[in-house]
């Protein structure tokens, strides 16, 4: 995961305005909206979130909310990216402190990658509604949602690839496909009660161990 994701959007009145086209005040109001949604997702499932309540909590007028996000799905997608950014900034801050302290990560590629995915799974364990939202957004055909999720995926992949020193590009690509696919399936089974959290972690770790066996 990497901080500072900029969500690109298509031009048009039925899609959210690009962050890069916003004034400082507009970016602040947009952040207030996504912050409110993130807080609400810790309390309720995505389908229970109402735009009016988001407006009330964020103290952003309902009309302004709809100018920024024409649909609830767009708002949820932007909030998912914002939540991911929070995790990314925290991770990068920890890595920065370790570098400044001269700490050397002597773990194998496999162990580093497994640790990163365990960390992501713990974030979903603390906020299972984010896992539910992730699955909903992954199934969406909306162009803005798909583009937002692609930005998020690319950022997360960049963070994972940074841990794969010495791994050939073709091997790394297949590893990401395999681990991400297992992660998505594990989240679907876990949130539906068909798999325990421990089972979800084990599935992801096992696949990571298999595809990165030569880098243990």
Predicted regions, residues:
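Hydrophobic alpha-helical segments that form the core
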Residues: 4-8, 170-192, 200-211
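Amphipathic alpha-helical interaction segments
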Residues: 32, 111-119, 133, 174-182, ...
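Hydrophobic alpha-helical connector segments
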Residues: 92-126, 201
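Generic hydrophobic, amphipathic alpha-helix propensity
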Residues: 26-37, 54, 79-87
